[in-house]
């Protein structure tokens, strides 16, 4: 069975946490980290690329985990990434989730991909917990 090839977009606290988690999964392989910052070193030694280099990884990464902030990053990054990659984000600006969904859904459909948005604690797992 082949491993799921993962890319991480953003390398702050959430990105480093995603990196640590992916490293523990026997069925996943971390391929690349993408950042706006230059001269970053990852904890695992995985190479860091610029955001402009992301499209070079089309077909080489199965899923992008977006680790930017909801206020300014994800609202722009998720639709852009969803055009080329299956992606997951943790968008948590409650009043804008419907707008975010609409934008990301349109981009993913145009690109023939899929996107899972607002997958975090709240909204996300905490919201599901309240249903049951």
Model feature map: region roles:
Residues 17, 24-44:
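NAD(P)-binding Rossmann-fold cofactor-contacting core
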Residues 54-63, 71-92:
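Rossmann-fold NAD(P) dinucleotide-binding segment
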